[in-house]
């Protein structure tokens, strides 16, 4: 039996499975009645379980309307929005559910649901249905947000329909009653750059300036990224120089925009060369560009270059942040440079950051890989006191590394310690530890670990 209960103070509904399994929920929905009892308080998880059941009906059933009608669910704005968002990967399912919801006399759609559906239809190239939804919004005097408008324009450009993007942009004030803001200009600029119409993009910026709007960082970044992706570095530099001469200096320095543009276009060597020239001249990128650069370079395997650039930038006065260390410490630990990882961690602490598990876990893993288990255990003990508490992934990693190194007694100790902290180990950890202990002749300890698993899982 299933009970459908209403939240006492709002419009949320939840499904509480009592005896039936989750898989049989749909079959039993037709016998549900909304109850007004307030003797128990359903949880937020129950509410989302109800949404999940409705989503499954919409996705899987050939005629979902009949099943939805049999549920006799109170249809609310938030409920419809969440179902639309969950079914956004299938615009036909979303549209069908929305049409069913609109047929409910107690439901009055808001712009939130309309816009979610319009974005889903636009992303799946269902432009005719999308325009019908937008017309319904206008007929109901519902405003279309700038975010939705920008999304549709960019989707047109992404799919190569730049003429429709320009038409929508030009008709924004009259057709949809929206303003041509900087964000809307940026979206059309993005659409033009997607199809390599750089002359049109540059003309759009000139029009933007004539209208009295000031380009922001994204305006510059879109055009620079587009030019860089087409291999037009010279044009990107000339554009930035011209905008500076006109008095429209970008919020970020031109060289930073060029570096990010090269990275986004995949020209890693050119970006490295530009940064090297900057540092030799005594200049450094801003911290955001620097972090993007070292992340891209470290992924390519050139960790030594990242370390060298880090120390050079620090000498030139760059104030690194926690994101810098989140990139560098795992990278140097992965290639076995444990001493360098410790130096970076000490610098992180001196900068006032309390180490997160994502910072010290890679060092522990690197030490275990090098066979430095005693040092790793000692360092882990220090981190439990001086840093943020270890989480489940850290313990799982440490237990796994102990198992690979044959340290099954230590792995068992960390398994018990993990449970004492309220963290539930995964089944693989239990299996690995018990098998290792049995193979090593420690059957009593293996039995205690098995009993611990039974207590935790109730199996």
UniProtKB/Swiss-Prot annotation:
Location of the protein in the cell: Mitochondrion
GO cellular component: mitochondrion
Transit peptide residue numbers: 1-7
Keywords assigned: Mitochondrion, Repeat, Transit peptide
Cited PROSITE patterns: PPR
Family matches, as Pfam families: PPR (PF01535), PPR_1 (PF12854), PPR_2 (PF13041)
Keyword Glycosyltransferase among record annotations: no
GO terms (BP aspect): RNA splicing
PPR repeat positions: 110-144, 145-175, 181-215, 216-250, 251-285, 286-320, 321-355, 356-390, 391-425
Entry similarity comment: Belongs to the PPR family. P subfamily.
Protein name, UniProt field: Pentatricopeptide repeat-containing protein At5g18390, mitochondrial
Organism listed in the record: Arabidopsis thaliana (Mouse-ear cress)
């Amino acid at each position: 039996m299933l009970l459908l209960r209403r939240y006492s103070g709002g419009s949320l509904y939840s499904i509480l499975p009592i005896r039936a399994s989750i898989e049989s929920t749909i079959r039993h929905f037709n016998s549900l009645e909304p109850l007004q009892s307030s003797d128990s308080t359903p949880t937020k998880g129950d509410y989302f379980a109800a949404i999940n059941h409705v989503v499954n009906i919409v996705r899987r059933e050939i005629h979902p309307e009949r099943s939805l009608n049999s549920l006799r669910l109170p249809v609310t704005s938030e409920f419809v929005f969440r179902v639309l968002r969950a079914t956004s990967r299938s615009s036909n399912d979303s549209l069908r559910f929305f049409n069913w919801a609109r047929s409910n006399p107690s439901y009055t759609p808001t712009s939130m649901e309309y816009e979610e559906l319009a974005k889903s239809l636009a992303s799946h190239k269902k432009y005719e249905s999308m325009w019908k939804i937008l017309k319904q919004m206008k007929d109901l005097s519902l405003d279309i947000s700038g975010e939705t408008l920008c999304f549709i324009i960019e989707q047109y450009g992404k799919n190569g329909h730049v003429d429709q993007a320009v038409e929508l942009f030009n008709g924004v004030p009259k057709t949809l009653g929206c303003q041509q803001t900087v964000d809307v200009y940026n979206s059309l600029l993005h659409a033009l750059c997607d199809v390599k119409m750089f002359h049109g993009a540059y003309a759009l910026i000139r029009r933007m300036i004539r209208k009295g709007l000031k380009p922001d960082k994204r305006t510059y970044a879109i055009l620079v990224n587009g030019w860089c992706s087409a291999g037009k570095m010279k044009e990107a530099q000339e554009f930035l120089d011209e905008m500076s001469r006109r008095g429209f200096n970008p919020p970020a320095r031109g060289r930073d925009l060029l570096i990010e543009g090269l990275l986004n276009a995949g020209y890693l060597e050119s970006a490295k060369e530009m940064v090297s020239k900057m540092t030799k001249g005594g200049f450094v990128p801003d911290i955001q560009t620097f972090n993007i650069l070292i992340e891209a370079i470290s992924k390519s395997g050139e960790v030594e270059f990242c370390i060298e650039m880090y120390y050079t930038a620090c000498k030139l006065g760059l104030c690194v942040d926690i994101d810098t260390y989140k990139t560098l410490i795992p990278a140097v630990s992965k290639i076995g440079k444990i001493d360098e990882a410790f130096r970076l961690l000490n610098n992180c602490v001196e900068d006032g950051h309390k180490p997160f598990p994502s910072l010290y876990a890679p060092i522990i893993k690197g030490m275990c890989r090098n066979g430095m288990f005693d040092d790793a255990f000692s360092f882990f003990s220090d981190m439990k006191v001086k840093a943020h508490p270890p989480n489940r992934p850290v313990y799982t990693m440490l237990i796994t590394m102990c198992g690979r190194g044959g340290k099954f007694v230590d792995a068992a100790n960390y398994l018990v310690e993990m449970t004492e902290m309220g963290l539930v180990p995964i089944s693989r950890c239990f299996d690995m530890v018990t098998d290792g202990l049995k193979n090593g002749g420690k059957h009593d300890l293996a039995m205690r670990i098995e009993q611990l698993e039974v207590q935790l899982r109730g199996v």
